[in-house]
């Protein structure tokens, strides 16, 4: 394990300290996947539930994706979903998880530790947990995590990977587990400070969740992923995961979101982040969320591909090529129901990403980093 010292409020890695290397890291296969938590939702973005088809025959989204090489699938779970949120309760997650496992897919469980969306702007404590002391909250995170995994295991839907929290760049279970990103005023309240006490809370929450997941799994524990956003931001990634290393948090996968529409950087930024993570932490790297939809700011320099079905395919080919060449273990597209399908329910161009990767010479000029070239 590496050694860290605190200097002027920051973490410094001691050069020459022994480093833990993840056994077999280089040989792990790459996987293309998707977050399909919306699959059985009655409506997506105001549209009625879609009927899928291919080659003139009605089919299931999961089956079509797997037929085209998409083999990993992510499902989110809320504690007690509020009416405004999708009903991603554990009870509703189990049937879809069983379908993934029965089809031979890899299953990533995304535990939000909230009754609704948890992301860099929202990390609300579940209503039933709000009056707990911090010690009791820590214990509840562990027991809840254990119960979720044990229930899935008993239902024949054991996850292969588990995210302990979703996009927790600013922590989780606010305000008790909230931390504040240095130099990112848009992320932090004006009075925010990156205090030792807040980091202590976040570390204890993460360790409790990890203990619970492993206890619920028994002798076949899933791999643990820690997920933050901004996959092209090495400075924030280093700041966050250095804290976890200093506290000896035991996890397996660095998972990050990468959305050009949300100014997460270019593919060159992502490449730098991934290669620096490999050098510094020796963990597997997963792009746990991505997507390519219209940008929220017209001057966004990261929007290098047309926002069209063909442009989305170009983006996915470039992204997958970059992540594979950088040694990543996978890419997961968020909510493919939104924009990877044609209006008639047939698969759009990006569904065929892996087919196009077989002959990159036939693709238009790409936006991959200079280090990425060739098939």
Show which residues each predicted segment covers.
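Hydrophobic faces of well-ordered beta-strands that scaffold small-molecule active sites
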Residues: 30-36, 73-75, 107-111, 160-164, ...
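Acidic-and-aromatic substrate-binding clefts and catalytic sites of carbohydrate-active enzymes
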Residues: 42-43, 50-57, 79-91, 169-172, ...
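Aromatic-rich peripheral "rim/lid" segments of glycoside hydrolase catalytic domains that contact
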Residues: 44-50, 179-188, 272, 276-279, ...
């Amino acid at each position: 394990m590496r050694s860290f010292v605190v200097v002027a409020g920051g973490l410094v890695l001691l050069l020459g300290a022994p480093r833990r290397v993840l056994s077999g890291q280089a040989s792990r296969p790459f996987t293309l996947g998707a977050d399909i938590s919306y699959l059985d939702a009655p409506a997506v973005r105001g549209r009625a539930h879609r009927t899928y088809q291919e080659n003139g025959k009605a089919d299931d989204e999961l089956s079509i994706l797997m037929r085209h090489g998409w083999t990993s699938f992510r499902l989110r779970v809320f504690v007690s979903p509020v009416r405004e949120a999708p009903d991603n309760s554990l009870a509703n997650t189990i049937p879809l998880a069983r379908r993934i496992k029965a089809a031979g897919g890899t299953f990533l469980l995304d535990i939000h530790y909230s009754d609704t969306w948890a992301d860099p702007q929202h990390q609300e404590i579940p209503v039933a947990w709000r009056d707990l002391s911090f010690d009791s909250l820590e214990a509840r995170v562990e027991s809840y995590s254990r119960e979720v995994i044990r229930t899935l295991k008993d239902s024949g839907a054991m996850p292969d990977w588990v995210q302990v929290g979703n996009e927790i760049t600013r922590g989780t279970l606010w305000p008790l587990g909230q931390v504040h990103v240095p130099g990112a005023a848009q992320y932090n309240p004006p009075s925010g400070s990156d205090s030792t006490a807040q980091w202590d809370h976040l570390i204890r929450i993460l360790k409790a969740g990890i203990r619970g997941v492993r206890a619920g799994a028994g002798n076949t524990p899933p791999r643990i992923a820690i997920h933050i956003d901004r996959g092209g931001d090495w400075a924030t990634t280093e700041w966050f995961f250095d804290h976890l290393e200093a506290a000896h948090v035991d996890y397996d996968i660095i998972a990050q979101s990468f959305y050009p529409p949300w100014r997460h950087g270019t593919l060159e930024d992502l490449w730098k982040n991934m290669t620096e993570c490999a050098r510094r932490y020796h963990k597997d790297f997963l792009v746990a969320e991505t997507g390519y939809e219209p940008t929220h700011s017209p001057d966004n320099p990261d929007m290098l591909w047309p926002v069209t079905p063909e442009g989305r395919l170009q983006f996915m080919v470039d992204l997958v090529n970059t992540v594979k060449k950088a040694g990543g273990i996978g890419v997961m597209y968020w909510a493919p129901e939104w924009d990877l399908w044609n209006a008639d329910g047939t698969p759009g161009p990006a569904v065929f990403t892996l087919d196009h990767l077989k002959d990159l010479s036939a693709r238009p000029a790409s936006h991959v980093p200079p280090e990425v070239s060739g098939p």
